[in-house]
């Protein structure tokens, strides 16, 4: 009599097989490819810009590197990094421009980096700006890929590198640092990681005054999530409360330093920056030649139309169940 053949006992569910391991490796490789394309595309746009700058600098006999790290706002940030706050310039018309108009995170990074690397604060500013540019492109890619797929993510990252004033991304300015913090904060919102979103938003609030828009976005996203899920997560509440702390802390610091609760806004007003409900924009458009004015109005109208279309289509929307922007029937657990 032949012996019965016993069936093989199945591997435990947690034991990886060669096929399973290979599949995971393939998935990771495929996930890295679009990200590499996004970052490579962004770097290419910046290298083209730097190449043009080098050609112009050589033709005019000027120092191109100095234009990147030693002009306009860059000078103010370097002075803060090296000497702290307290510098003012009085204009011929009597207006006073104070360095308190500039937020502290970027010069703090310049100061810290120049302390550990053999570079001055101005060069450290370029290192921060260029590194943050890559981080921003990565974050923009993640947001786009989460909402619309990998192709959308790649296109968004590259387009950010070629928008009309993208040249400042190559300078020792705060645009790249702020954009990186904003992009990753919004990505954290999309993933339901509210505490991470709040912390990144708070850091953005120490970088630029435009963080108020990011603070509003985090708050609105939380409200939408509460309406859709009909519950409030403690992590969501914590993230929303943390989000404005950076911006509020600096505004309070300026107020205490200058002994006036409106000191920060007074400083900004002296620089010609204020919220006027669009009056300054209307005056700017009215002062343009008619062709330029017409083109700008058409662009603004198209932008408004695009916003309407996005709202009608329910954008942004993702199929991921971890997103607060999923269909209302999807249950989401907020995470930090």
Per-segment meaning from a language model:
Residues 171-177:
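Short acidic/glycine- and proline-prone juxtamembrane loop motifs at membrane-interface regions
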Residues 112, 127-147, 304-308:
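Transmembrane-helix motifs of polytopic, lipid-linked glycan transferases
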Residues 147, 154-165, 169-171, 184-190, ...:
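Transmembrane and membrane-interface helices of multi-pass
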């Amino acid at each position: 009599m032949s012996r019965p053949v016993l069936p093989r006992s199945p591997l435990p569910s947690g034991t990886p097989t060669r096929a399973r391991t290979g599949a995971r490796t393939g998935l990771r490789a495929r996930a890295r490819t679009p990200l590499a394309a996004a970052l490579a595309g962004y770097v290419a746009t910046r290298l083209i810009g730097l190449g043009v700058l080098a050609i112009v600098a050589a033709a005019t006999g000027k120092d191109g590197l100095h234009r990147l790290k030693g002009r306009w706002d860059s000078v103010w940030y370097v002075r803060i990094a090296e000497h702290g706050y307290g510098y003012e310039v009085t204009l011929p018309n009597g207006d006073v421009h104070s360095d308190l108009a500039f937020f502290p995170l970027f010069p703090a990074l310049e100061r810290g980096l120049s302390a550990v690397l053999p570079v001055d604060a101005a060069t450290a500013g370029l290192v921060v700006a260029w590194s943050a540019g890559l981080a921003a492109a990565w974050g923009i890619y993640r947001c786009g890929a989460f909402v619309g797929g990998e192709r959308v993510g790649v296109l968004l990252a590259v387009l950010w590198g070629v928008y009309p004033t993208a040249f400042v991304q190559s300078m020792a300015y705060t645009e790249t640092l702020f954009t990186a913090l904003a992009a990753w904060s919004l990505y954290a919102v999309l993933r339901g990681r509210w505490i991470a979103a709040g912390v990144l938003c708070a850091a953005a609030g120490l970088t630029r005054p435009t963080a108020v828009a990011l603070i509003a976005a985090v708050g609105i996203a939380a409200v939408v999530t509460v309406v859709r899920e009909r519950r409030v997560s403690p992590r969501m509440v914590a993230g929303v409360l943390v989000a404005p702390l950076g911006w509020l802390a600096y505004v309070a610091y300026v107020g205490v330093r200058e002994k006036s609760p409106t000191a920060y806004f007074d400083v900004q007003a002296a620089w010609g920056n204020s919220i006027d409900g669009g009056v300054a924009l209307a005056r700017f458009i009215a002062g343009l030649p008619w062709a330029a004015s017409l083109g700008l109005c058409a662009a603004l109208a198209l932008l408004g139309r695009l916003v309407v279309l996005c709202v009608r289509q329910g954008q942004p929307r993702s199929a991921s169940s971890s997103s607060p922007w999923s269909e209302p029937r999807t249950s989401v657990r907020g995470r930090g």
